[in-house]
Amino acid sequence: MEHKDNSTMYGTTILCIRRGNKVIIAGDGQVSLGHTVIKNSAKKIKRLANDTVITGFAGATADAFTLFERLESKLEKHPGQLLRACVELAKDWRMDRYLRRLEAMMIVADKSVSLIISGNGDVLEPENGIAAIGSGGNYALAAAKALCESNDQFSQNMTLEYIITTAMKIASEICIYTNNNIIMEKIED
């Protein structure tokens, strides 16, 4: 994520892992303004649609809250249809002159699907049930994939909470815009 100026808040790590009937989204708590840490305990994960959807954002905070509100209204118009609501949001985000300027990405999940939504109009379902966004996203993604795809006996017995916490901790040790104050939300069927 490019840091254009010191007046915009950037940098975070959001990680989503789905296994079986459980999905967890985790985010770190750091908010940076330029090269300065402003807050260590921000909550970047939110529940929507009567707690049936969880979402996390990376990017400018005010922009993300605008997108949360828009997504919530799309979910009200299309209850129980997360994919359709996300596609409608992405279309608006790409076409609307005001929304096009928003600088954020989102991971959204319900009991059956996980999606990444970008301002380019992309709605992507990740492979292998693992998705990550933000400045530390690639580190968290690599760590989560390594933990999930290992074939040894230990990895098969790891809980999703352990995997996501470990992957986020690894990302926080590499990315200067990510801390180890991890907040998680989960949906379990």
From Swiss-Prot:
What InterPro entries has UniProt attached to this entry? Answer: ATP-dep_Prtase_HsIV_su, Ntn_hydrolases_N, Proteasome_sua/b, Proteasome_suB-type
Active site located where? Answer: T12
Task: Give the reactions, separated by semicolons, that this protein catalyses.
Answer: ATP-dependent cleavage of peptide bonds with broad specificity
Single Gene Ontology MF annotation: metal ion binding
The EC number on file is 3.4.25.2
User: What are the alphabetically sorted keywords of the record?
Assistant: Allosteric enzyme, Cytoplasm, Hydrolase, Metal-binding, Protease, Sodium, Threonine protease
Tell me the superkingdom of the source: Bacteria
Its activity is regulated as follows: Allosterically activated by HslU binding.
Q: Is Hydrolase found in the keyword set?
A: yes
Pfam families assigned: Proteasome
Q: Which residues bind Na(+)?
A: S172, C175, T178
Biological process (GO) annotations held by this record are: proteolysis involved in protein catabolic process
How does this protein assemble? A double ring-shaped homohexamer of HslV is capped on each side by a ring-shaped HslU homohexamer. The assembly of the HslU/HslV complex is dependent on binding of ATP.
Q: Which family does it belong to?
A: Belongs to the peptidase T1B family. HslV subfamily.
Q: What does this protein do?
A: Protease subunit of a proteasome-like degradation complex believed to be a general protein degrading machinery.
Task: Output this protein's name.
Answer: ATP-dependent protease subunit HslV
